[in-house]
Amino acid sequence: MGYSYSEKKRIRKDFGKRPQVLNVPYLLTIQLDSFDKFIQKDPEGQQGLEAAFRSVFPIVSNNGYTELQYVDYRLEEPEFDVRECQIRGSTYAAGLRVKLRLVSYDKESSSRAVKDIKENEVYMGEIPLMTDNGTFVINGTERVIVSQLHRSPGVFFDSDKGKTHSSGKVLYNARIIPYRGSWLDFEFDPKDNLFARIDRRRKLPATIILRALGYTTEEILNLFFDKITFEIAGDKLLMTLVPERLRGETASFDIEANGKVYVERGRRITARHIKALEKDNISQVVVPSEYILGKVASKDYVDLESGEIICPANGEISLETLAKLAQAGYTTIETLFTNDLDYGPYISETLRVDPTYDKISALYEIYRMMRPGEPPTPESSEALFNNLFFSAERYDLSTVGRMKFNRSLAFPEGEGAGILSNEDIIAVMRKLIDIRNGRGEVDDIDHLGNRRIRSVGEMAENQFRIGLVRVERAVKERLSLGDLDAITPQDLINPKPISAAVKEFFGSSQLSQFMDQNNPLSEVTHKRRISALGPGGLTRERAGFEVRDVHNTHYGRLCPIETPEGPNIGLINSLSAFARTNDYGFLETPYRKVVDGQVTEEIEYLSVIDEANYIIAQANSNLDENNRFTDAFVTARGERGESGLYKPEDIHYMDVSTQQVVSVAAALIPFLEHDDANRALMGANMQRQAVPTLRADKPLVGTGMEKPIALDSGVAVVAKRGGTVQYVDASRIVIKVNEDETIAGEAGIDIYNLIKYTRSNQNTCINQIPCVNLGDPINRGEVLADGPSTDLGELALGQNIRVAFMPWNGYNFEDSMLVSERVVQQDRFTTIHIQELSCVARDTKLGAEEITADIPNVGESALSKLDESGIVYVGAEVKGGDILVGKVTPKGETQLTPEEKLLRAIFGEKASDVKDSSLRVPNGTSGTVIDVQVFTRDGVEKDKRALEIEEMQLREAKKDLTEELEILEAGLFARVRNLLISSGADAAQLDKVDRTKWLEQTIADEEKQNQLEQLAEQYEELRKEFEHKLEVKRKKIIKGDDLAPGVLKVVKVYLAVKRQIQPGDKMAGRHGNKGVISKINPVEDMPYDENGQPVEIVLNPLGVPSRMNIGQILETHLGLAAKGIGDQINAMLKQKQEVEKLRSYIQKAYDLLGNGSQKVDLSTFTDEEVLRLAGNLRKGLPVATPVFDGADEAEIKELLKLGGLPTSGQITLYDGRTGEKFERPVTVGYMYMLKLNHLVDDKMHARSTGSYSLVTQQPLGGKAQFGGQRFGEMEVWALEAYGAAYTLQEMLTVKSDDVNGRTKMYKNIVSGNQHMEPGTPESFNVIMKEIRSLGLNIELDEE
């Protein structure tokens, strides 16, 4: 495989045995594709906004003479770009303009003649736009809309598993779930009657629904039952025989025909008997007349003369009715065929409990159930019933629902409408009865074929439709008011309801979440999260164990490992690495096709529904060089996802990758296959909490997943086109694009501006650092600059640390860690946190608040860091309590004493009618001010600081644009120069003249002259565009800000805090091995090896066996080997050995065992490239051990050997304090450690004086409230056990809720009297009040 220039800088040795057939797909597809469908980037097909408009329009007036038609829509360009929206705190959105047509028809004309057409464009609010990274900027913060896993529309058959009724009888039910509209349920009760419910309301006999559809009793019976025909022949009764129906019954009479007895009375009829009857073609048998008694008539039998009903349909036949039927001249009687085994009489029984008798009474019954208390009329009942299931406006199964419905009921695919038909309802009842009869089985609700993904686009479309429907009602009213001559579409539409619905969804829906921006991985995982919670989903409390559990259909679709611990476990899942959604919203996963035992390169995506019929081999099945299975039997998944052994020729598909099963976060854990799943879950979750360190350090032991995550997360800058680096500094990179990638007529220069020191949602620091040099050749898609937690385009969440597993004086008890001081000195885990503090000046009733440096009663020193506008300088170092922005608020006039009045009169002091409400640094925080932004309302005069900031922004904008122009001009003039020189001009002459004069030259060659003219035009264009961009920027900067009502000014101050690692900080490895730092130990006290190299962290060996995460030990060994090879390379470089020796050693390392899929050939590298590679391998050879396909023991030992290290992975250590040898070798190696965002600085606080709870008068709790520490029940026991009575009394009274006692104590302390008088705690009063509220009087007698 060929490596590009930047890939040659550092190559990861890959232990994967299996070639990668399919690269990891773009990780944010699920978000971006869904939103593109919503705003319909691809104009084909009706979806998203288009579908919403089409479903609501045209809106027709009630009289039908006017209608408002939809023509098309367009999205405007957003006013501000993403970055500006974040700074200003506004929403990144585009205005929606819709072209509507108002058509009115002539009322007088008989044919619909058009009288008038008005068409214009209407503004319909704003639609938030998705950024390139799949997020939304709402009110200045980045948010993610999490996809939802909900029950797919369609029909589901289920049972209560015997839990409802005390007898344990299993009751079956069917539920038709539409995409929108009313649910229709059918269910059996314990007496086996079939009932229906609409929208989970009161149940009705199911036959009422059938009657409402217009079926009579006879038709209903015909739909659900087979018939038995009896013939009356004189005094004999003959029954038409269908032998198959007799199976399992006991004969109540001799079954005989043609003088031969086939079954004797009292015998059970078996298959042998049935065969004999079929063989002799017996079609009728004589039955005794008692046999027909109790059978049910299938239709009405009427006396033709009198018109009287002898036996109604569904009526039982008795001797009397039999005689009457014979008398009336009936020779055949049809009855229903039922038995106890597999043809139950359920519908017949239900008809008996059904109080209705015809269509209208059934409609009335449904109306009373849906709208209790309203008197039904025939019209309203009919309309209500039709609107429930048969109106396309109110009911929609959707294409997914119809597809699931047809598959479930074995209807032809693709037939049927979005509404229900009579046949649909009957088919559902039939299937439910079949299931009750023991044919067919219920669905599994947790099967991923019955749950589908609703992504951003679809949810936004639904919200948009809700808004449109609200608008539709208003428009209908307006259209029916008349006077339409003066009205235009613009007057009819009020965009408020639409923008309100959209805003509410993006701003406050349960699925619109504040993006987790701790590090690139947490961003990617958040966007790939699938939640079963949210509107229309489950709730935590109601979700049982089954829903949360791993299901076999999750294979390759949802990760079985990554899910939160706690109440949401199993409800929030993560998409597997290769999974995607199909058009219906079901999850699919890729497989390689297998033909006759040969695995092809062809890849197919299968959904769970399609997968059911195939046998699928695992990705680690052994193949020979022709891609044939080598084993006689292959482990594969067959029917129902159960695994078993199959012959190679029976296999249809094979997994594409071993990482297919897990999500990206779990795929980052090396040796995942050796970790217990519970710990792997913690590992996957904790990687998302890692704070980006000051200097990112790639993991020595990775999995190969680091690169795709870093690239797809969008934190690194990736080249859009290939070229050469022309300019690079800390804030911008300029690439001269390759000739073959430029578009004709453009300058061929790409400029990338980098993000510097900005704040993320979690207060971590986002900063991009260039990783290319001048003149480097660049390919498209390569990394130009590293973002937070990326190192040469690879995800780097933590640091490679030398660890030893051994006890050390109890400092690693219970998962604590002992850390060497060297780690702190080298700033290995130092992180930068940026806090945003804002100060808002409002207009109050008493007057406007003012931002000023003139603050009453504040000393000079407190104002030393403020400028004359009262705002802190950039670069000032501040600590808790310092003023950042001086602000005064007017306070109401107070009554002054005569003395004060006199003083006022003499000194004219007016300052005391304002109070200080300045923004101060919160307690316990300190840092450096790195940025200040001032936002001023339109029409309010800007202060000096705001003008300075404005001027600076204008200067920077102009400088940026000028530099951009210069770069582009240079590119353009270089082309002009080449053109002129190729036409014979003298280079030296050209360089003497002003460049702009070059464009005025004339060339004899016409084609070249045209090119020159084109370039001259481009130059003009560039100039114009520069002026235009500058003007736009200027307007944006000068323009007043759009602030909330009543707000005059907002000042935002950004503080950067540098945090070193310290005791109490939480750290973790990638295997769920987390712990807290107990002590920072001097380097000289740490255990060291024979070369005098100390370890950096000491971990507790007891944390490994019981937790069963052995992956960490293998990682440590492999890390040691990788570092050993790095050390060898480093030694060679230091000794300045010849390049060939270096090349062969590095080649040996790459060629060592287990390089199945990756071949690195260093002979194609130049000496310079080998040296650059060696320089990057000094700190260790990075290795990749893919999940389930990683390095094994033998390979690790070989690598250790090559690094000149003991193959046991254990080293003799010496105690740093005494220099004595420890009694046995210790496992030492390199582990990748992360610092998690649970820092002791954010958690520790101590209360001095603070607020009290209103009712109990006890101090509040928690850091946010500046609360105290609860002295709880168990702590009281401790003091009681010591007999410390006075201490205990103090704790329970004056230090807690004895209000008088604590004020007295304060007075005593102030007056120097160390005395305390405890009183009655407030809790006693509270409990007395509570007892009184129960109606019990309680009084305290003072005796």
Swiss-Prot record:
A GO CC term attached to the entry: DNA-directed RNA polymerase complex
Catalytic activity: RNA(n) + a ribonucleoside 5'-triphosphate = RNA(n+1) + diphosphate
Top EC class for this record: transferase
Record-stated family: Belongs to the RNA polymerase beta chain family.
Superkingdom as given in the UniProt entry: Bacteria
Subunit structure: The RNAP catalytic core consists of 2 alpha, 1 beta, 1 beta' and 1 omega subunit. When a sigma factor is associated with the core the holoenzyme is formed, which can initiate transcription.
Record-level Gene Ontology MF annotations: DNA binding; DNA-directed RNA polymerase activity; ribonucleoside binding
Biological role: DNA-dependent RNA polymerase catalyzes the transcription of DNA into RNA using the four ribonucleoside triphosphates as substrates.
Gene name of the record: rpoB
Species in which this protein is naturally found: Haemophilus influenzae (strain PittGG)
Classification via HAMAP family: RNApol_bact_RpoB
Pfam assignment, any one: RNA_pol_Rpb2_1
EC number(s) reported in the record: 2.7.7.6
InterPro entries in alphabetical order: DNA-dir_RNA_pol_bsu_ext_1_sf, DNA-dir_RNA_pol_bsu_external_1, DNA-dir_RNA_pol_su2, DNA-dir_RNAP_su2_dom, DNA-dir_RNAP_su2_hyb_sf, RNA_pol_bsu_bac, RNA_pol_bsu_CS, RNA_pol_bsu_protrusion
Ranges in a coiled coil: none
Keywords: DNA-directed RNA polymerase, Nucleotidyltransferase, Transcription, Transferase
Keyword Nucleotidyltransferase included in the entry's annotation: yes
GO biological process: DNA-templated transcription
Name listed for the protein in its UniProt record: DNA-directed RNA polymerase subunit beta
